[in-house]
Structure formats: C-alpha cells, structure tokens
C-alpha cells in the first residue's frame, strides 16, 4: 500500500480549465478577462475559435492573480462570439 503524501499540496496544483464565449463588452474593451479561480496559476494554454476557425494569430494572452486576459493583437481582435478554451496550471 502506498504511503501518504505529506508536505505537498498537490490538489492546489491540479489544472483548471474552462470555455468562455466573448461578449460585446469584451469586444469594446479590446480584451476578454476570465477569472479562472486559480490565484496561484503560473501558466496557461489558450485556444481561440472565431467564426468556426481556430485563430493562431497574435492574440495576447496573459495571466496574473488567477485572471486570464486575452487581448487584441495587431491582427487578432477580440470579437463577441469568440470561443476561448483555456487551461491554467
């Protein structure tokens, strides 16, 4: 039988994921802000689907204090209806 894990808070390091659909307010703010609920997250993976097509262009994702921000780039613009799939860890 395996022993217990002590000294490691492994549950708080489990990835959290979700799907966010951009709204008109995100469009006018030039960014979508997603509260992931994981304040200690240090990394993120983001996939954006716009009009049924995966956007691989220059969206600008950033992560601070559990809030994932996807901002406009030089060619990508956050648009109401964009589907943002995300994982933070």
Residue ranges and their predicted role:
Residues 1-33, 38, 75-89:
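Extracellular receptor-binding modules and their adjoining Ser/Thr/Gly/Asp/Asn-rich linkers
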Residues 15-19, 42-44, 64-67:
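Short, hydrophobic/aromatic-rich segments at coil-to-beta transitions
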Residues 29-31, 65-69:
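A generic structural signal for beta-strand entry/edge sites
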């Amino acid at each position: 039988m395996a022993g217990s894990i002590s000294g490691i808070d492994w549950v708080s390091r489990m990835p959290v994921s979700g799907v966010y659909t951009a709204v008109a307010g995100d469009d006018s703010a030039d960014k979508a802000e997603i509260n992931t609920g994981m304040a200690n997250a240090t990394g993120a993976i983001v996939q954006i689907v716009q009009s049924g097509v995966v956007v691989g262009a220059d969206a600008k994702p950033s992560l601070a204090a559990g809030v994932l921000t996807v901002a406009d780039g030089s060619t990508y613009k956050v648009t109401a209806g964009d589907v943002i799939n995300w994982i933070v860890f």
